[in-house]
Amino acid sequence: MKVDGRSPWHLWAVGLIALLWNGFGCFDYTMTQTRREDWFAQMGMTAAQLEYFNAMPSWTHAAWAIGVWGGALGAVLLLMRRKWALHVFVVSFLGWLAGAVYAFALSDGMEAMGSMWPMQVVIGAACLFFIWYAWTMSKTGVLR
């Protein structure tokens, strides 16, 4: 890709999608951490899911925070065309990965999540896509 100082159109599209995606994650994190009962009801969480969530160790909540807030920061850095976007997206992925390991290997998270467990796979795939995209833009000289 020839870099002429302007951002390619897809950088803005991917950056905006990343910001919206991770922005929702930040909103969900905030609403969940502040124990908004109306949010739990709106999300359709069952009593068993709330019990599972309330029993999660604090390190999983920290990993979740790193995942969502790191993803939002990565999106902003991507829109600013900064190479640090790649590193921040990797840290965000590691936050997601820590939570996924707990949910799928160290607890009965898959059972507790019910039909929502595939969403974790979608989130992980989105993280990997944003890493790949930032890496590609970095290698082609779009990110500085």
Where in the sequence are the language-model features?
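Topology signature of small-to-medium multi-pass alpha-helical membrane proteins
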Residues: M1-R144
